[in-house]
Amino acid sequence: MALVKRNNNMALIATEAGKLAAVKAGQVMLSPAGRELIWNGVNWVRRKLGRSKKSDVILHPGVLPGAIAAPVANTRIIRASKPKFTRSKGSVTIAHRELLGQFNNSSGLVVNGGVSGNLYRINPSNPVVFPWLQGIAASFDQYKFDRVQLQYVPMCATTETGRVAIYFDKDQQDVEPADRVELANMGHWTESAPWCESTLNVPVDNVKRFMNDNTTTDRKLVDLGQIGLATYGGGSTNPVGDLFIHYTITLFEPQPLASLVETEQSGAGAAPFGTNLVTVSSNATTTIITFRGPGVYLLALSQRAASFTTLVTAGGAVVNSHTTLFSGPAYQSIANITATIPGGSITYNGTLFGNYTLQVTRAKISNNATLI
């Protein structure tokens, strides 16, 4: 029997037995079985704590629960997304990811890069949101989204100030939020610092809808809704991040290929048709063509005019090649343009501008528009 001694409280303190127990416990902890036992216990505790409590454990000291501390640096590895096709009788299901574009910081509230007019309507025929999917969807009459998720991926330093918000609006004809109060009242909305990645799951409703390959009076019949990205509170106009859309969609009812060319016209008998790649505004001295999304475009413009003077780009648009000729009461211009961000534009200047006809389609830079 091990020797023991009595303390002032008449309690027994096991000396030799305590030392022996400590040695045995240490041996168990250092053994493979002991290490596995300990880690299993830790994982069990973490599972019981729940997700929010686990976040509290790994966040920086002094950071309140639910907050995110700014790291020295972070990044996201973006890898190629290969579309997945699943075929069934009369339909095809596609899962893919696409890039909507790059966005810049701003001091005041700027929504969708400053481009208005329900830019990001969720319809597979909308080339601004689905530049890759649109070419496939043009061969079908109906669609149904099974999953839609927005992902904001930062590309700025953690010293960048401001806020970035992404949102979903079920009514695709609502105007964009005009201030922070309207933005904060969105039913589906998430917001973070520019350097913080964020995601938003868009609710889907298992409803079959028609493609919007022509002029539709009520867009609520053809669109799932609209999405948007807003920036504010920044101290610069630096690029802050990219917006991606992840989706799973089922296409129904194959049809002859719909037009991938947009036609815009003015004057009596005008018949706009096709996709919605640009917006056009014109007066007696200028015609401005604004690109709703990034990409390379081929434009063919004919317009009545007394004279034509210059062609100017703005907002990140670049002329790759062009030919513009003036003869008599009209001028004609064909141009290959790259728009780097939503809202890039090209302006035609002259005198006594009148009716116009414009054709727009997506292209490659190698589609040279120069007259040789």
UniProtKB/Swiss-Prot annotation:
Domain of life: Viruses
Intracellular or extracellular location(s): Virion
Organism: Pothos latent virus (isolate Pigeonpea/India)
Disulfide bonds: none
Function comment: Capsid protein self-assembles to form an icosahedral capsid with a T=3 symmetry, about 32-35 nm in diameter, and consisting of 180 capsid proteins.
Signal sequence interval, chain numbering: none
MF (Gene Ontology): structural molecule activity
One Pfam family it belongs to: Viral_coat
Family, as annotated: Belongs to the icosahedral plant coat protein family.
Subunit structure: Homomultimer.
Keywords associated with the record: Capsid protein, T=3 icosahedral capsid protein, Virion
Name of the protein described by the UniProt record: Capsid protein
CC per GO annotation: T=3 icosahedral viral capsid
Location (main, coarse): virion
